Amino acid sequence: RVGEMMQLAKPDLRVYIRNGMSAADQVSREIHENEVYRLIRHHWMMEVNLTEAPKVIPFPAGIELRPFVREAQEYLVFQAEDEAFRDHWGHVPGNFNNWKLRKIDREAFDPTLWHIAWDGDQIAGYAQTRYRNEVGWIGNLGVRRPWRKRGLGEALLLHSFNEFYKRGMLTIGLGVDASNPTGATRLYQKVGMQIAVEDVIYEKELRPGRDLESEE
């Protein structure tokens, strides 16, 4: 069956099997290691439990939040997200229709939980948040490269915390690659988030070739 699936990939592409599991699941980890899978990544779910209103910090000069307007802005947000995540592990250029179906065309979608930071007519950063299993969930937090290292990510994160706090949601979580190249884990720890769950990702290469994840 694996051979049949490989035939679906273009002949020049790298093919691999990738599985994730709890870091504490020693049985599954040993099975994968015995089958010559490589440990390639650690993934954290981080949480914070709010006991008081989070602090508020100003947004960088020239940056303002505007309400998310679905039809007018959804493609712009898609583009901003795709750009912001180009240097993240596992990134593959996205497809707008699939993105829209997964994120916006959902019955539970609440546009007031999407916080978009603008610099003039350019999206500088965003926080896409939602409710997930009784937790306020930061589904995606991103800052485009020209606006990094100015405190925008922290301002967006704390703004999201405050919006959840106002709605009575005191537990807030997110998922992050433990080796995130933009320093996201340091930011999350700075605002009081702690590791709640750690997963590991194993990979076994079936065929070498061109890797879509390494291309922009």
Positions of predicted regions on the chain:
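Conserved acetyl-CoA-binding loop-helix of GNAT-fold acetyltransferases
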Residues: R1-E4, V143, K149-K166, T171, ...
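Acyl-donor-binding surface of acyltransferase catalytic domains
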Residues: R1-G62, E198-E205
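Conserved hydrophobic beta-strand within the GNAT/NAT acetyltransferase core sheet
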Residues: I17-G20, I138, I172-V176
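A short, internal acetyl-CoA/4′-phosphopantetheine-binding micro-motif in the GNAT/acyltransferase core
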Residues: M21-S22, L141-K149, A178
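Conserved active-site tyrosine of GNAT-family acetyltransferases
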Residues: S28, H32, Y188, M193
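Conserved N-terminal entry element of GNAT/NAT acetyltransferase domains
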Residues: N49-E71, G209-E216
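A short beta-loop-alpha structural element at the N-terminal edge
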Residues: E64-Q79, G90
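A conserved beta-strand-loop-helix scaffold within acyl/acetyltransferase catalytic domains
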Residues: R86-R145
